[in-house]
From Swiss-Prot:
Upper classification of the organism: Bacteria, Bacillati, Actinomycetota, Actinomycetes, Micrococcales
EC number(s) reported in the record: 4.1.1.48
UniProt xrefs under Pfam families: IGPS
GO term, biological process aspect, one: L-tryptophan biosynthetic process
Keyword hit for Transport: no
Family: Belongs to the TrpC family.
PANTHER family hit by this protein: INDOLE-3-GLYCEROL-PHOSPHATE SYNTHASE (PTHR22854:SF2), TRYPTOPHAN BIOSYNTHESIS PROTEIN (PTHR22854)
Organism: Paenarthrobacter aurescens (strain TC1)
Protein name: Indole-3-glycerol phosphate synthase
Pathway of action: Amino-acid biosynthesis; L-tryptophan biosynthesis; L-tryptophan from chorismate: step 4/5
Amino acid sequence: MTVLDDIIVGVKEDMEVRRGLVSLAELKERAANAAPARDAWAALGGPSSIRNDLKVIAEIKRRSPSKGDLASIADPASLAVQYADGGASVISVLTEQRRFGGSLADFDAVRAAVETPLLRKDFTVDEYQIWEARAHGADLILLIVAALSDAELADFSALSHELGMNVLVETHTEEEIERAVAAQAKIIGINVRNLKTLDVDRSVFGSLAGLIPAESVIVAESGVRGPEDVSHYAAGGANAILVGEALVSDSTPRERITEFKAAGAAAIAVRN
Protein backbone atom coordinates (compact mmCIF):
# COMPACT_ATOMS: atom_id res chain seq x y z
CA MET A 1 0.00 0.00 0.00
CA THR A 2 1.36 3.44 -0.94
CA VAL A 3 1.36 6.44 1.39
CA LEU A 4 -1.49 7.94 -0.64
CA ASP A 5 -3.52 4.74 -0.37
CA ASP A 6 -3.02 4.67 3.40
CA ILE A 7 -4.09 8.30 3.77
CA ILE A 8 -7.24 7.68 1.74
CA VAL A 9 -8.22 4.72 3.93
CA GLY A 10 -8.15 7.03 6.96
CA VAL A 11 -9.96 9.81 5.11
CA LYS A 12 -12.82 7.47 4.24
CA GLU A 13 -13.09 6.19 7.80
CA ASP A 14 -13.19 9.69 9.25
CA MET A 15 -15.70 10.82 6.64
CA GLU A 16 -18.09 8.03 7.62
CA VAL A 17 -17.94 9.21 11.23
CA ARG A 18 -18.89 12.73 10.13
CA ARG A 19 -21.60 11.37 7.85
CA GLY A 20 -23.12 9.68 10.88
CA LEU A 21 -23.31 13.05 12.61
CA VAL A 22 -24.32 15.28 9.68
CA SER A 23 -26.35 13.81 6.83
CA LEU A 24 -25.83 14.68 3.18
CA ALA A 25 -29.28 16.27 3.16
CA GLU A 26 -28.28 18.56 6.02
CA LEU A 27 -25.03 19.49 4.27
CA LYS A 28 -26.96 20.39 1.13
CA GLU A 29 -29.21 22.67 3.16
CA ARG A 30 -26.21 24.33 4.80
CA ALA A 31 -24.52 24.75 1.42
CA ALA A 32 -27.63 26.40 0.02
CA ASN A 33 -27.58 28.90 2.87
CA ALA A 34 -23.84 29.60 2.73
CA ALA A 35 -22.49 32.87 1.35
CA PRO A 36 -21.62 32.63 -2.37
CA ALA A 37 -18.19 31.25 -3.17
CA ARG A 38 -15.42 33.69 -4.00
CA ASP A 39 -13.72 33.40 -7.40
CA ALA A 40 -10.44 31.66 -6.63
CA TRP A 41 -9.57 31.34 -10.32
CA ALA A 42 -9.69 35.12 -10.72
CA ALA A 43 -7.71 35.53 -7.50
CA LEU A 44 -5.00 33.28 -8.95
CA GLY A 45 -4.71 35.31 -12.14
CA GLY A 46 -7.73 34.32 -14.19
CA PRO A 47 -7.29 34.89 -17.94
CA SER A 48 -3.73 34.41 -19.16
CA SER A 49 -3.66 37.94 -20.57
CA ILE A 50 -3.59 39.49 -17.09
CA ARG A 51 -1.12 37.23 -15.27
CA ASN A 52 1.83 39.50 -14.60
CA ASP A 53 2.89 38.42 -11.12
CA LEU A 54 3.22 35.29 -9.01
CA LYS A 55 0.31 34.40 -6.76
CA VAL A 56 0.78 32.68 -3.42
CA ILE A 57 -1.49 30.00 -1.97
CA ALA A 58 -0.44 30.11 1.68
CA GLU A 59 -1.14 26.93 3.62
CA ILE A 60 -2.05 26.31 7.25
CA LYS A 61 -0.53 22.95 8.10
CA ARG A 62 0.49 21.56 11.50
CA ARG A 63 2.30 18.47 10.31
CA SER A 64 2.96 16.33 7.27
CA PRO A 65 3.63 12.64 6.56
CA SER A 66 7.14 13.46 5.35
CA LYS A 67 8.31 15.85 8.10
CA GLY A 68 6.10 15.07 11.10
CA ASP A 69 5.22 17.99 13.38
CA LEU A 70 5.82 21.40 11.80
CA ALA A 71 4.04 23.92 14.03
CA SER A 72 1.44 23.82 16.78
CA ILE A 73 -0.69 26.67 15.30
CA ALA A 74 -2.88 27.32 18.32
CA ASP A 75 -4.66 30.14 16.47
CA PRO A 76 -5.13 29.37 12.76
CA ALA A 77 -7.29 32.47 12.32
CA SER A 78 -4.46 34.75 13.44
CA LEU A 79 -2.05 33.03 11.07
CA ALA A 80 -4.54 33.41 8.22
CA VAL A 81 -4.76 37.15 8.88
CA GLN A 82 -0.97 37.38 8.63
CA TYR A 83 -1.11 35.46 5.35
CA ALA A 84 -3.75 37.80 3.97
CA ASP A 85 -1.82 40.87 5.11
CA GLY A 86 1.26 39.52 3.36
CA GLY A 87 -0.58 39.32 0.06
CA ALA A 88 -1.67 35.69 -0.19
CA SER A 89 -4.17 35.31 -3.02
CA VAL A 90 -5.66 32.11 -1.60
CA ILE A 91 -5.33 30.50 1.82
CA SER A 92 -5.21 26.71 2.01
CA VAL A 93 -6.47 25.06 5.19
CA LEU A 94 -5.70 21.39 5.82
CA THR A 95 -8.73 19.55 7.16
CA GLU A 96 -7.26 16.03 7.12
CA GLN A 97 -6.64 15.08 10.75
CA ARG A 98 -4.59 11.88 10.95
CA ARG A 99 -1.52 12.85 8.90
CA PHE A 100 -1.77 16.65 8.76
CA GLY A 101 -3.39 17.65 12.06
CA GLY A 102 -6.13 19.67 10.41
CA SER A 103 -9.85 19.96 11.00
CA LEU A 104 -13.02 21.61 9.80
CA ALA A 105 -12.90 23.62 13.03
CA ASP A 106 -9.65 25.16 11.75
CA PHE A 107 -11.35 25.91 8.46
CA ASP A 108 -14.33 27.56 10.16
CA ALA A 109 -12.03 29.73 12.29
CA VAL A 110 -10.13 30.91 9.22
CA ARG A 111 -13.31 31.50 7.23
CA ALA A 112 -14.59 33.79 9.97
CA ALA A 113 -11.32 35.75 10.05
CA VAL A 114 -10.55 36.57 6.39
CA GLU A 115 -12.27 37.41 3.12
CA THR A 116 -9.50 35.79 1.08
CA PRO A 117 -10.63 32.81 -1.04
CA LEU A 118 -10.10 29.55 0.85
CA LEU A 119 -8.96 26.14 -0.37
CA ARG A 120 -10.36 23.25 1.62
CA LYS A 121 -7.25 21.06 1.44
CA ASP A 122 -8.13 17.41 1.83
CA PHE A 123 -8.21 14.15 -0.08
CA THR A 124 -11.54 14.33 -1.89
CA VAL A 125 -12.90 10.87 -2.64
CA ASP A 126 -16.66 11.33 -2.21
CA GLU A 127 -19.28 13.91 -3.14
CA TYR A 128 -20.09 14.22 0.57
CA GLN A 129 -16.81 16.10 1.04
CA ILE A 130 -17.66 18.52 -1.76
CA TRP A 131 -21.00 19.45 -0.23
CA GLU A 132 -19.22 19.63 3.12
CA ALA A 133 -16.64 22.04 1.75
CA ARG A 134 -19.28 24.39 0.35
CA ALA A 135 -21.35 24.18 3.54
CA HIS A 136 -18.31 25.41 5.47
CA GLY A 137 -17.65 28.28 3.06
CA ALA A 138 -14.94 26.85 0.81
CA ASP A 139 -14.22 28.59 -2.48
CA LEU A 140 -11.82 26.01 -3.89
CA ILE A 141 -11.31 22.28 -3.39
CA LEU A 142 -8.49 19.90 -4.23
CA LEU A 143 -8.88 16.95 -6.57
CA ILE A 144 -5.83 14.67 -6.80
CA VAL A 145 -5.74 12.89 -10.14
CA ALA A 146 -3.79 9.93 -8.73
CA ALA A 147 -6.60 9.26 -6.25
CA LEU A 148 -9.52 9.38 -8.69
CA SER A 149 -10.89 7.69 -11.78
CA ASP A 150 -11.65 9.77 -14.86
CA ALA A 151 -15.36 9.50 -14.08
CA GLU A 152 -14.83 10.71 -10.51
CA LEU A 153 -12.62 13.55 -11.69
CA ALA A 154 -15.31 14.69 -14.14
CA ASP A 155 -18.22 14.24 -11.74
CA PHE A 156 -16.52 15.90 -8.77
CA SER A 157 -15.37 18.82 -10.95
CA ALA A 158 -18.88 19.29 -12.31
CA LEU A 159 -20.44 19.24 -8.85
CA SER A 160 -17.89 21.71 -7.51
CA HIS A 161 -18.56 24.13 -10.35
CA GLU A 162 -22.30 23.68 -9.92
CA LEU A 163 -21.86 24.81 -6.31
CA GLY A 164 -19.83 27.83 -7.43
CA MET A 165 -16.44 26.54 -6.33
CA ASN A 166 -13.24 26.30 -8.33
CA VAL A 167 -11.11 23.16 -8.42
CA LEU A 168 -7.35 22.76 -8.04
CA VAL A 169 -6.53 19.58 -9.96
CA GLU A 170 -3.26 18.12 -8.70
CA THR A 171 -0.90 16.15 -10.95
CA HIS A 172 2.55 14.61 -10.74
CA THR A 173 3.09 12.89 -14.10
CA GLU A 174 2.55 13.53 -17.81
CA GLU A 175 -0.32 11.04 -17.87
CA GLU A 176 -2.02 12.81 -14.97
CA ILE A 177 -1.68 16.17 -16.72
CA GLU A 178 -3.32 14.67 -19.81
CA ARG A 179 -6.21 13.53 -17.63
CA ALA A 180 -6.49 16.95 -15.97
CA VAL A 181 -6.54 18.69 -19.35
CA ALA A 182 -9.14 16.23 -20.65
CA ALA A 183 -11.26 17.15 -17.61
CA GLN A 184 -10.98 20.82 -18.68
CA ALA A 185 -9.27 21.85 -15.46
CA LYS A 186 -8.75 25.62 -15.20
CA ILE A 187 -6.33 25.39 -12.27
CA ILE A 188 -3.72 22.63 -12.55
CA GLY A 189 -1.17 21.93 -9.86
CA ILE A 190 2.10 20.11 -10.36
CA ASN A 191 3.15 18.53 -7.08
CA VAL A 192 6.87 17.84 -7.14
CA ARG A 193 6.34 15.51 -4.19
CA ASN A 194 5.31 11.99 -5.18
CA LEU A 195 2.40 11.25 -2.85
CA LYS A 196 2.97 7.53 -3.22
CA THR A 197 6.56 7.67 -1.91
CA LEU A 198 6.82 11.24 -0.48
CA ASP A 199 10.01 11.83 -2.50
CA VAL A 200 10.57 15.40 -3.76
CA ASP A 201 12.04 16.14 -7.20
CA ARG A 202 11.86 19.83 -8.13
CA SER A 203 12.90 19.09 -11.70
CA VAL A 204 9.49 17.48 -12.22
CA PHE A 205 7.92 20.92 -12.50
CA GLY A 206 10.07 22.07 -15.40
CA SER A 207 9.53 18.85 -17.31
CA LEU A 208 5.73 19.02 -17.01
CA ALA A 209 4.68 22.69 -16.96
CA GLY A 210 4.95 23.06 -20.73
CA LEU A 211 2.28 20.39 -21.20
CA ILE A 212 -0.41 22.55 -19.58
CA PRO A 213 -2.47 24.86 -21.84
CA ALA A 214 -1.80 28.58 -21.47
CA GLU A 215 -5.38 29.29 -20.43
CA SER A 216 -4.99 27.17 -17.29
CA VAL A 217 -3.46 28.59 -14.11
CA ILE A 218 -0.34 26.56 -13.28
CA VAL A 219 0.39 26.01 -9.59
CA ALA A 220 3.75 24.72 -8.32
CA GLU A 221 3.21 22.59 -5.23
CA SER A 222 5.77 21.46 -2.62
CA GLY A 223 9.50 22.02 -2.39
CA VAL A 224 9.52 25.75 -1.63
CA ARG A 225 12.33 26.42 0.84
CA GLY A 226 13.12 30.00 -0.07
CA PRO A 227 13.17 32.67 -2.81
CA GLU A 228 15.47 30.58 -5.01
CA ASP A 229 12.87 27.84 -5.31
CA VAL A 230 10.18 30.41 -6.00
CA SER A 231 12.29 31.92 -8.79
CA HIS A 232 12.89 28.44 -10.21
CA TYR A 233 9.17 27.69 -10.40
CA ALA A 234 8.23 31.12 -11.75
CA ALA A 235 10.91 30.95 -14.44
CA GLY A 236 9.60 27.51 -15.39
CA GLY A 237 6.07 28.72 -16.01
CA ALA A 238 4.32 28.80 -12.63
CA ASN A 239 1.53 31.33 -12.19
CA ALA A 240 1.22 30.49 -8.50
CA ILE A 241 2.93 28.54 -5.75
CA LEU A 242 1.37 26.56 -2.91
CA VAL A 243 3.57 26.79 0.16
CA GLY A 244 3.01 25.63 3.72
CA GLU A 245 6.05 24.35 5.59
CA ALA A 246 8.24 27.37 4.81
CA LEU A 247 5.54 29.67 6.21
CA VAL A 248 4.33 27.81 9.30
CA SER A 249 7.92 27.27 10.44
CA ASP A 250 8.81 30.97 10.00
CA SER A 251 8.31 33.56 12.74
CA THR A 252 7.42 36.25 10.18
CA PRO A 253 5.15 34.59 7.60
CA ARG A 254 3.75 37.92 6.40
CA GLU A 255 7.19 39.12 5.37
CA ARG A 256 8.03 35.70 3.92
CA ILE A 257 5.06 35.87 1.55
CA THR A 258 6.09 39.36 0.45
CA GLU A 259 9.59 38.04 -0.22
CA PHE A 260 8.26 35.11 -2.25
CA LYS A 261 6.02 37.37 -4.32
CA ALA A 262 8.92 39.69 -5.11
CA ALA A 263 11.13 36.78 -6.19
CA GLY A 264 8.35 35.42 -8.38
CA ALA A 265 7.59 38.77 -9.98
CA ALA A 266 11.26 39.27 -10.87
CA ALA A 267 11.47 35.84 -12.50
CA ILE A 268 8.23 36.37 -14.42
CA ALA A 269 9.48 39.73 -15.71
CA VAL A 270 12.51 37.96 -17.17
CA ARG A 271 10.35 35.11 -18.50
CA ASN A 272 8.03 37.51 -20.30
